[in-house]
């Protein structure tokens, strides 16, 4: 394979990698835990936080609600990580692309 063909192949791989990254970044992932629903972008920036309760939150329920937020956020982030690995993992062992 000549040098020009190698460079062309590397450019195509880089384009594919950027397309995969853009797809992950623009995807919205949802994490939920009982009363809490969190939406995050693939960039791990939080899009929205919802508390699904028609009842007022009592003072003694605050710690439980905080735990629900942690579970929901971590769940959404795990989904981001999983999709990132699925989309970007094939590029991990290619030297010079990062």
Walk through the language-model features, giving the residues of each.
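N-terminal intrinsically disordered, cationic/polar leader segments
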Residues: 29-50, 57
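Stable alpha-helical structural segments in soluble proteins, enriched in small hydrophobic residues
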Residues: 68, 72-80
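A short, polar/charged loop-to-alpha-helix boundary motif
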Residues: 57-66
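Long amphipathic alpha-helical segments used for membrane anchoring, targeting, substrate engagement
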Residues: 1-30, 79-98
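Residue-level signature of catalytic and energy-coupling elements of molecular machines
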Residues: 10, 44, 69
